C-alpha cells in the first residue's frame, strides 16, 4: 500500500464538537479534505446555521446538530441521531471549549465549575457516548483538543489549565483502557492560535503598537508568529487516520516551538 493511502479518511464519519468556526471548523475542513463525512454540533441553532453556511462555501456537505455537550442526556440523544441519520462515528474530535481569564482569587466557584464542565467533563461525556459503537465496529479514533496549558501555568487561567491538564490525563486513560479494542485516543495541544477567543490579546493599541501580550507571545515563540487554525488540520488528519494506528495516549503540541524554548538570554 502506498503510504499516502494510510492518510485517507474515505468512508469515515467524523464528529467534531463546537465546530461552527475557529479551530474546530479548520479541523473539520481538513478531515473532509481527506475524505471524511463531517458532523458537528454547537450550542445554539444560529451557530449551527452559520457553520452549515461556512461549510457549504467550502463545498462541504456537513451535518449540524444543536447540542450542549455538558448535558449527558442531550449528548446521548445526539449520538443516537447521528448513528441513525449519518452512520456510526469513526472519529471523534473533542474540540468544544471555553476560557475565562480571571485571576484565581477573583474567580467564583461557579465560574471555575463552568470551565471544568465544558473543557473536561464534556469530552468525558461525549467519549463515553461514542466508545461503545467504536468497540462494536472494531476501531475508533478520539482526538482531544488539549493546550499548552496542559503543561504550563500562567496567571488568570487557573480553571482552563486545570481542565486542560485533566484532559491530557483523560486522553492517556482512554488510550490505556480502550487501546485493546483498536481505539486510539490522542490529543493536540495548540499553542497561541489566532481565533475569536484570542482576538482581545492581539488588539492594536491606540498608538498603533502591538498589544503587550502579542509582543510577549512573539518573543516566546521560535516561529515568531501566532498559529492559525489551519495549522491544526494536518495533525488532526494524521491522528484520525490509519497512519497513527500505533500512536496512542500522546499529546501532539502544535505550538511553534514555545514549549521547547526557554527564551533569549538578556
Describe the predicted segments one by one.
Residues 132, 176-180, 245:
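Alpha-helical segment proximal to the catalytic Tyr-Lys
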Residues 102-105, 152-158, 180-181, 224, ...:
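Active-site loop immediately N-terminal to the catalytic Tyr-X3-Lys motif
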Residues 127, 163, 171:
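Active-site helix of classical SDR
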Residues 103-104, 111-116, 213, 217:
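Substrate-binding pocket helix/loop in short-chain dehydrogenase/reductase
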Residues 13, 20-22:
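Conserved glycine-rich cofactor-binding loop
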Amino acid at each position: 500500500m502506498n503510504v499516502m493511502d494510510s492518510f485517507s479518511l474515505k468512508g469515515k464519519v467524523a464528529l467534531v464538537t463546537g465546530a461552527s468556526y475557529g479551530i474546530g471548523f479548520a479541523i473539520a475542513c481538513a478531515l473532509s479534505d481527506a475524505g471524511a463525512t463531517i458532523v458537528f454540533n454547537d450550542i445554539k441553532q444560529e451557530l449551527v446555521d452559520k457553520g452549515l453556511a461556512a461549510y457549504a462555501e467550502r463545498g462541504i456537505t456537513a451535518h449540524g446538530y444543536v447540542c450542549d455537550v455538558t448535558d449527558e442526556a442531550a449528548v446521548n440523544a445526539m449520538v443516537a441521531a447521528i448513528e441513525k441519520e449519518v452512520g456510526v462515528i469513526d472519529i471523534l474530535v473533542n474540540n468544544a471549549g471555553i476560557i475565562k481569564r480571571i485571576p484565581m482569587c477573583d474567580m467564583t466557584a461557579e465560574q471555575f465549575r463552568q470551565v471544568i464542565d465544558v473543557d473536561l467533563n464534556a469530552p468525558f461525556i461525549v467519549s463515553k457516548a461514542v466508545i461503545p459503537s467504536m468497540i462494536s465496529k472494531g476501531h475508533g479514533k478520539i482526538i482531544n483538543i488539549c493546550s499548552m496549558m496542559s503543561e504550563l501555568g500562567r496567571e488568570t487561567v487557573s480553571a482552563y489549565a486545570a481542565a486542560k491538564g485533566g484532559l491530557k490525563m483523560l486522553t492517556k486513560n482512554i488510550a490505556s483502557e480502550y487501546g485493546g479494542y483498536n481505539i486510539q485516543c490522542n490529543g493536540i495541544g495548540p499553542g497561541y492560535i489566532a481565533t475569536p477567543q484570542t482576538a482581545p490579546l492581539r488588539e492594536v493599541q491606540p498608538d498603533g503598537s502591538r498589544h503587550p501580550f502579542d509582543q510577549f507571545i512573539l518573543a516566546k515563540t521560535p516561529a515568531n508568529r501566532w498559529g492559525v487554525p489551519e495549522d491544526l488540520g494536518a495533525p488532526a488528519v494524521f491522528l484520525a487516520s490509519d497512519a497513527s494506528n500505533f500512536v496512542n495516549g500522546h499529546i501532539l503540541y502544535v505550538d511553534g516551538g514555545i514549549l521547547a524554548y526557554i527564551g533569549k538570554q538578556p
